[in-house]
Amino acid sequence: MDSEELLYHVKITTHIASDIVAAEVDEDAMMLLEQAIIDSVGEANLRPPVHTPGGEDFHHYAVQRPALKTTMLGLGCGLEPGLHHPHMKFNHTRLITGVEILTRVLLAAIQKAQ
């Protein structure tokens, strides 16, 4: 901001109104999740990771607990018209798929830690 203040001869004051952090994906956690997806729904349903500049409140876990290995699961469930939209709808049977994937990744993480 200093350069803009000098360039335009103005004083710029900022205020951070919220604290949102970006995702920090751990490579080991991502590999465990990928294998859990393959084991649950098959390799044909595994998609490349999506890289997003967005923030999410769950990403604070990695900041507050740096030793925690984190990643994200994008569960294809036909969600529309958008997350948090008042008329959001999705295929509820995919929740069972999500539970299976997360159970497998947790069991694999426990086994790897032993």
Task: Name the predicted role of every residue range.
Residues 1-114:
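Metal-dependent amide/peptide-bond hydrolase catalytic core
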